[in-house]
């Protein structure tokens, strides 16, 4: 008899997640705004009610992804800081130390798929709202959804690149060869 295959790390199986509740909430928030919008457009027909409920779900998704799911599932976090004296705004990125925290392949795969698929679905809904001119008023809600989901997507993509670059720099400059060379040079200079 053949034994059933055991699920492997990296498969799209939420049971393999290191943080299954965080993952399920992440997926729930990501899909609930889309489902509310679709259900509202097709069945409810009350624009104000659907707009408010979808906006609340989008806001909860934005907050949860930015502050909880990103940190727990892939060890990334971002925020925006404003210099009060100059008024300049810049994004700050934070990533967990790869030596102290392991990110499971399943969590990583779910996170990045959910992050990139959601804006693509909202873009499809925007095209649909434009094509069916009777639903053009719904485009305002889709535009807000696109702004929120694309902001998180861009920020986490930059945060991931920043985290990979700093990890590479730490490995390059933290190695024993580099420390021996710099230690030898500094030792000669200050004898």
From Swiss-Prot:
Its main location: Golgi. It comes from the Eukaryota. GO terms for cellular component: Golgi membrane. Keywords: Glycoprotein, Golgi apparatus, Membrane, Transmembrane, Transmembrane helix. It is found in: Golgi apparatus membrane. The keyword Transmembrane helix applies. One of its GO terms (biological process) is protein secretion. Pfam families: DUF846 (PF05832). The keyword Cell division does not apply. It is a multi-pass membrane protein. Glycans are attached at residues 83, 180. The chain crosses the membrane at residues 16-36, 38-58, 110-130, 136-156. Belongs to the TVP23 family. Golgi membrane protein involved in vesicular trafficking. This is Golgi apparatus membrane protein tvp23. It comes from Aspergillus clavatus (strain ATCC 1007 / CBS 513.65 / DSM 816 / NCTC 3887 / NRRL 1 / QM 1276 / 107). The lineage of its organism: Eukaryota, Fungi, Dikarya, Ascomycota, Pezizomycotina.
């Amino acid at each position: 008899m053949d034994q059933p295959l055991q699920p492997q790390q990296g498969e799209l199986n939420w049971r393999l997640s290191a943080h299954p509740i965080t993952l399920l909430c992440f997926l729930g928030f990501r899909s609930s705004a889309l489902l509310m919008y679709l259900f509202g457009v097709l069945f409810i027909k009350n624009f104000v009610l659907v707009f408010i409920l979808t906006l609340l779900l989008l806001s909860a998704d934005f907050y949860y992804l930015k502050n909880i799911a990103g940190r727990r599932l892939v060890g990334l976090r971002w925020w925006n800081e404003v210099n009060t004296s100059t008024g300049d705004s810049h994004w700050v990125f934070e990533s967990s130390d790869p030596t102290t925290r392991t990110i499971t392949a399943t969590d990583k795969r779910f996170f990045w798929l959910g992050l990139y698929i959601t804006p693509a679905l909202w873009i499809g809904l925007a095209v649909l709202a434009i094509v069916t001119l009777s639903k053009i008023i719904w485009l305002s809600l889709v535009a807000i959804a696109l702004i929120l989901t694309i902001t998180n997507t861009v920020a986490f993509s930059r945060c991931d690149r920043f985290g990979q670059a700093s990890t590479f720099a730490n490995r390059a400059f933290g190695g024993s060869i580099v420390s021996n060379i710099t230690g030898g040079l500094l030792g000669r200079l200050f004898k």
